[in-house]
C-alpha cells in the first residue's frame, strides 16, 4: 500500500480511526496522527452508539450515521449489525424520505456514488470508472429517482435511495461494502420545487424521455457490464413508464433485478405463501384483488402470475385469478389510458352483469368476493370496515395486505383488520406494525418489506455468478421466505421479522445460489452453493493493514 496517512484516514474502506494498532500506525505513517489509546471496534461502537442516542430527532440520527458511514464503513456496519432493527428505518425507509427532501441543504459527501448525467452520455464509462476507483464491483444499485418511495420525482436527490439500499444489502446479507456502487442517472426532474430551488444539485431541466432517455440507459448498461462483468445490476425507483420496459429488455441478457417490480412482488408472494401455509389452502384456489395498479401493484400481480404458472396453470388460466382496481375502478380491456402492465390484467365487461357499476373498491369486492386483497394505492383508509367484513363473509381466512407507506398512506391498520374479521385475517403491512392483542391471542404482523428478500436474493445471485435471474429462481426464493412461518403458533406472522434478517438472508442466499447452479446458470464452476455463499460473506471486523 502506497497511500499517505491522510489518504488512509480519509478512505472509509481503510480507515479504522483509533483502532489502528501501534504496529499499523508505525507501518502506515500514522504515528502521532491519532490519540495514543488503541480502541477495539467494540469500544468504538459503544462510543458511537452513545452519540447516536444523544441526537434529538431521527433525521439528526440519520445524519450522524451517514457521517460515520462516510468515515469508517467497517465501524458503521459493525454498529448496524448490533442494532439492525433500530437502524433500518433510519438509514432507509421511512427516514430516508426526509433526507431526500433535504438533500440539497444536507449534502456533504457523494458517498462513493456515481452521478451519470443524461446531458453527458460520452462521460458514462469514465463516471463509473472514477466512482469505482479500482474496486472490484459486484453489485450496482441504480436509480433515476422518478418514482421515489411513493414520493414521486426527486431528481438527483434520489441517490440516497441507492446508497440506503446498499447499506441494507451489506447489513442483512454481508455483501462487502467495498464491492458495491450506488448510481444516480440524472435525467432531469419534473419536480418544479427542485427546479425552482437555487441549491438543487442536479440537471436543471425537465426529465428527458423517449429515444434520448433509453439511449442513455443502453449506454449505461453497456458500460456497467463492460467494467463490472461479474456484477448484479439492481434497478430502483424508476418511473412506471420506464421500469417495466427496461426490465423486459435486459432480464434475459444479464443478471438484473428491479426491486419495485420484482422485489415487492416477491415479498408479497412469500407472504401469501406463508399465509397459505397457515390456512392450509392452495394458491390455485385464490381470487386476488390488487388495489392500486401502478408499478408496485402490477409487479406483485406478475410475480403471483408466475407462481400460478409454476404451479401448473396456463397463462390465461392464471390471469383469471386477478382483479386489478385503480382510480377508475375495476380495469376492463376497454378502459382508457392503460399501461402495458395493466393491460395484461384487465377483465371483460361481459363477465359482469353490473360492469358499469364497478367503479369503486367496495362494489368490486361485493362482485368478486376476493380471498386475497393487496393495497398499493397510497389511498389512506380505503380498506374500510364494511369492505373488510364483506370480504370476510366469503372466505374463512382472508389474506389482507395494506402495503402503502408511510403510515399516513396505509389502506388500513392491522389492529382494525384483526378486529373486523374476528381474528381470522392473515395480515401483512407495508410499515412496521405492533403486535395486536385480540381475545387472548397475540397476533404478530408481518411487514411486507422488500428488505426481507432482496439482500439474500442478490447475495445468492452474486455468490453463484448467475448469468440471469429467472422465474424458477424467483419462485425458489419466495418459497424459502414463506416457509419460515411458524404454522403451529396462533397469531403467527405470515413473514419473518426484520430482527432475524441476517439469519434468513443467509438461508435465502443459499437457496438462490443452489437454484442457479441446478439450472446451470452460473458463469463460474461452483461445487457447493453453501460454501460459495460462506466464502463471499463479509463480516464487519477490522483486518490487518500493512504497507
UniProtKB/Swiss-Prot annotation:
Active site: 92, 165
Binding-site positions, NAD(+): 293-296, 405, 450
Record EC number: 4.1.1.101
GO cellular component, one term: cytosol
Reactions listed under catalytic activity: (S)-malate + H(+) = (S)-lactate + CO2
Residues involved in substrate binding: 165, 450
Keywords: Lyase, Manganese, Metal-binding, NAD
GO biological process: malate metabolic process; malolactic fermentation
One Pfam family matching this protein: Malic_M
Keyword Metal-binding among record annotations: yes
Cofactor section: Mn(2+); NAD(+)
Subunit record text: Homodimer.
NCBIfam families documented for this protein: malolactic, PRK13529.1
Function noted in UniProt: Involved in the malolactic fermentation (MLF) of wine, which results in a natural decrease in acidity and favorable changes in wine flavors. Catalyzes the decarboxylation of L-malate to L-lactate.
Record-given protein name: Malolactic enzyme
Organism: Lactiplantibacillus plantarum (strain ATCC BAA-793 / NCIMB 8826 / WCFS1)
Protein encoded by which gene: mleS
